[in-house]
Amino acid sequence: VGDWFQTIVDVEASPEEAGALAEGVRSWLVSSGVVSAERTHCILGAELGHPSGPRAGEVVDASGWSGPWQGGLEINVGRTVFDGGQGDPTAVSCPHCSATVELMDDDFQLDRQAWEPFRDVVHGWDEGRDVVIPCPSCGRPVEPAGWRWDDDYFVFGHLGFRFWNWPPLRTGFVAGLTARLAGHRVVFLDGKL
C-alpha cells in the first residue's frame, strides 16, 4: 500500500510564465469537470489540492483498479525538483556527449562518491541555486535542468501537475493537457511514496 502519483512537468516554462500557464490548465480542468474548483485536503504533502471532478473517470484507465478511487491534483508553480518517489536515482547522462554516470554500486546501493556532485545539483536547485558541474566524461558544463536522469527520476522545472492516487492517465488526456502549455516540452513521471 502507498500513495501513487503521476506528474506532468513543463520543463520549458519560465518562472515568469508558469503562473499563467498553470491557471490556464487549471481553468480547463475545472470547466471540463476533471477536477473540482474547490480546494480540499485531498493530496499528500501539500495543504490543499483539487479533488477529482465528476468527469475524472473519462481521463483515466481504471480497468485495473478495484473499488472507488479518489485523489487530488497538486499544481506546483515555482522552482521545484520533481522526483520519482521511493528509491534512489540509478544513473544520469550528459546532454552533450550522452556519457552515463552510474549512481548505484554492485549491491544496488547508492554510490556516495558518484552521487556527491549530483546531490549538490539537486539540493542546490531546491534551494534556489544553479549548481553547474562539468560532465565527468567530456568536461563541458551542464546546467541543472540539462542532466538526463534514468527513468526521469529527477525533473527540474517551474510548473508541474501531480495527480495523487489516480488510475493511469489516458494518453489523449496527457496530450490535451500538454497542448495547453504553449508547445513546451513536457516530461511525464510516475512514482510511489
Regions found by a protein language model. Give the residues of each.
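Glycine-rich, often proline-containing surface loops adjacent to acidic residues and nearby aromatics
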Residues: 1-5, 91, 99, 152-162
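N-terminal alpha-helical interaction blocks
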Residues: 1-92
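Amphipathic alpha-helical segments
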Residues: 21-30, 97-100, 172-181
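Residues immediately within or flanking Cys/His clusters that coordinate Zn2+
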Residues: 89-91, 132-135
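Short cysteine-rich clusters marking metal-coordination/redox-active sites
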Residues: 94-97, 135-138
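Short, non-ligating residues that shape and space the ligands of small metal-coordination modules
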Residues: 101-104, 144-145
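Short linker/helix segments within small regulatory modules
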Residues: 115-133, 150-151
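Long, contiguous alpha-helical scaffold regions
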Residues: 145-193
